[in-house]
Amino acid sequence: MPTFLFLGSGEFEPWSTEVETIALAGAVGDGSVAILPTASAAEGDHVFERWGQMGLAHYRDDGVPAAVVPIKTPGDARRDEFIAAVEAASMVYFSGGKPSRLAGVLRDSPLLVAIHRALDRGAVYAGCSAGAMVASRVRDAGGRRGTSWLFGLGLVPHVSFGVHWDRAARIPGAQWWMTSRLPDDTWFVGIDEKTAILGDGVRWSVHGRGRVTLRGPGEDATYRAGERFETPSP
């Protein structure tokens, strides 16, 4: 089974060390983390490099080997040396930024194929903010605009993920708009800031400071750190 680690915000901060340690303990690979700040590339090289350095410092403090894989464009996602680095790692970590940018780089790329191969052999896909959102189900073919995330790549094919979910609650109508337009057979998981979920796509555990909101077929519930929930395939 694949392993996913999704964070609502707060990548490369001390609060996430515990759940990352749990995830890496069961991961298959060379023991390293491949850091991909791809979603921030549109904001300029200085932002991309800052996120990369934050990741390196975080894992250095935790005693975990890590390297930045500098994928910024669709062309980069076809480079053999970058694909090899992703395939070898125990954890492939996409930090935050613009989900549309990240999805555009990954969609139909050899890198995405490599990520699936890594998951199949036991690596962890970790994503914070945009990195979590692109794991959502693929938009239905021919569906009207807004019925599912346009940037979902289907890593978890029956779930859509929202991030910064507690912040979204402070924007009138934002949560309703995002959840009311999802297909009826889709689970929705809203992850608060500085909160994470770890699981295999069906069974999840909650970690961090906030809550996780689950909505789906016959379900409307919230969960906190130490609790578990499921998102079974329809």
PLM ranges: what are they?
Residues 40-101:
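Portal/gating segments that form or line small-molecule/metal binding sites
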Residues 33, 92, 129, 161, ...:
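A residue-level signal for conserved active-site and pocket-lining positions in enzyme catalytic cores
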Residues 95, 101-171:
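Class I SAM-dependent methyltransferase SAM-binding "motif I" and its flanking Rossmann-like core
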Residues 6, 67-69, 93-94, 125-128, ...:
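General beta-strand structural signal in soluble alpha/beta enzymes
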Residues 31-32, 65:
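Residues at the starts of beta-strands that form the adenosine-phosphate
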Residues 1-30, 39-53, 58-60, 139-141, ...:
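C-terminal and late-domain segments of enzyme folds
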Residues 19-22, 81, 114:
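A short acidic, amphipathic alpha-helical/loop segment
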